[in-house]
Design a protein with these regions (language model features):
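Active-site neighborhoods and metal-handling regions in enzymes and metal-associated proteins
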Residues: 1-488
Length: 488
């Protein structure tokens, strides 16, 4: 990587050279002649006639709903800032979900402000870093300047794309400090903005805003459903990519699987929606195995839990448990088929008017039946479920909301989510599993080290549900046929 030397570089780190007095207002290492050269000779690259982003009409409707919920109050929703990885390198930026949901914008330092226009109604303004002109040197001297990290949109361009008036964010903190009237802000994304609002907000009022924005995302609009399907379709292709290279993964490690899927995510989307779980052999018994540094062995199972995130930040979340050599052993098939039967029961319970917990209860009932049938638990099944004894091997809940966050709507109230009722437009995962740890002495030896999870992304429809990830086979026999075809 190139190493920038900016005006902010501490004096002791500046080159030990003698420079004549400069008039250009930059730092001593820049001659007046160079400064003048860098100010001129540039074409006008302002973009005109830009089409609004695809979700612009939807983000407007979301802001209108937000305005109705908090009349007469100033609302501040930051995108967030770059986070340091180490020294002078940063993590890839990902805008806060709340900000992206309401604007469609994904640039760092952005802030959406809804200013009340009276007892009801708001005007929305998005505050952004404008393009730097060619006068102050920022565009070529700063490590975040245009010649270092790329062109950012001008404020006029941003207005065309987002359909929201845009202003310079560098003036916002001072304006917020001086502003009067009730204010709410989404916390945790921008310390500068939070500092400006310290004496104007309370945690309780801000939490109400965060909760509202979480619950507002529960029912997806048409744009969101399309993006989720796009994410799932790319994920299906990513799983196919993995099957085709399992022989190479056997020669290396789980990292080969992770890298293969990541390639698909970056080619077709923005990124992976979460850390890919590429768990081979006994690692499949670790629910969130993201180290992905283990061996991949023929005869073992591979639990692959991964999802592509689209450019608009909607993610898939799909899991398949695959026989690495293409064929399940008898005990692997027995456990897999039990999980498949459990998932079938869970998916059937997803429908409008059902309780969110219904699909979890349906799935768990099947797994409890299997564990009693296999002699691993003493019945009756209802006693097992009442005491939660099956959870030694099922461990986790059977699903969660899905959207811009892999675990979407996480701040929603209990009564609106886990104790709530399903509605058309909600999207959730159904993902039962059985996990027999390698050191579990309460099960026969042949069970030990086998972990199975099957996960699909299910959209609640007016008359039932639709499996967005139906393009990936689930039944054990269908999985084997699919793998054989892909391996050639």
């Amino acid at each position: 990587m190139a190493d920038e030397l900016t005006p902010e570089t501490p004096e002791e780190e500046q080159p030990k050279k003698t420079h004549k007095q400069r008039k250009n207002g930059l730092y001593p290492g820049v001659s007046d002649e160079l400064a003048e050269s860098m100010r001129s000779g540039w074409a006008d690259t302002e973009l005109h006639g830009l089409e609004p982003i695809a979700q612009a009409a939807h983000t407007l409707a979301r802001r209108d709903a937000l305005s109705r919920r908090f009349p007469g109050e100033r609302l501040v929703i930051p995108a967030g800032r770059l986070k340091t990885r180490s020294n002078d390198t940063e993590y890839p930026f990902r805008a806060s979900t709340e900000y992206a949901y309401l604007t469609g914008d994904q640039t760092e330092n952005g802030v959406l402000v809804l200013e009340p226009t009276g007892p009801t109604g708001h005007t929305a303004t998005v505050y952004l870093l404008p393009r730097s002109d060619r006068e102050n040197g920022e565009f070529w001297l700063s490590g975040q300047g245009e010649l270092w990290v790329g062109r950012r949109h001008s404020l006029a361009e941003a207005e065309q794309l987002l359909g929201i008036p845009a202003k310079d964010v560098r003036k916002l903190a001072e304006a917020l400090t001086e502003a009067e009237g009730p204010v709410r802000a989404v916390r945790g994304h921008d310390a500068v903005i939070e500092s400006a609002l310290t004496d104007k907000v309370t945690k309780e009022r801000d939490e109400e805003l965060r909760v509202y924005l979480s619950e507002a995302r529960a029912v997806k609009d048409a744009f969101e459903i399309g993006e989720l399907q796009k994410a799932v379709d790319s994920t299906v292709r990513g799983f196919e990519d993995v099957v085709k290279v399992l022989d190479k993964a056997e020669a290396t490690s789980e990292r080969y699987i992770e890298g293969t899927f990541f390639l698909r995510a970056r080619v077709e989307g923005n990124d992976v929606g979460y850390g890919s779980i590429c768990a081979a052999g006994p690692h499949a018994c670790t629910l969130h195995w993201v180290r992905n540094d283990g061996d991949v062995r023929s005869g073992d199972l591979l639990l692959l839990d991964a999802g592509v995130e689209t450019h608009s930040l909607y993610t898939a979340d799909v899991t398949r448990t695959l026989p690495i050599n293409g064929t399940y052993t008898d005990i692997q098939r027995k456990i897999y088929d039990a999980v498949y039967e459990s998932q079938e029961a869970g998916i059937a319970a997803v429908k409008p008017g059902a309780k969110f917990r219904d699909f979890h209860d349906a799935s768990q009932h099947v797994l409890a039946e299997k564990l009693v049938e296999w002699g691993l638990l003493d019945g009756p099944v209802e006693r097992v479920l009442e005491l939660g004894l099956q959870r030694r091997w099922t461990l986790h809940g059977t699903g969660h909301m899905l959207g811009m966050d892999v675990h979407d709507c996480a701040a929603a109230r209990t009564e609106a989510y886990v104790e709530g009722t399903l509605e058309p437009g909600m999207c959730l995962t159904v993902e039962p599993g059985l996990y027999f740890q390698a050191d579990d002495l309460t099960v026969p030896e042949e069970y030990r080290g086998i972990g199975v999870r099957i996960e699909d992304d299910i959209l609640v429809t007016e008359d039932g549900n639709r499996n967005l990830s139906a393009g990936l086979p689930r039944a054990s026999s269908e999985v084997e046929v699919w793998m054989a075809r892909l391996k050639g």
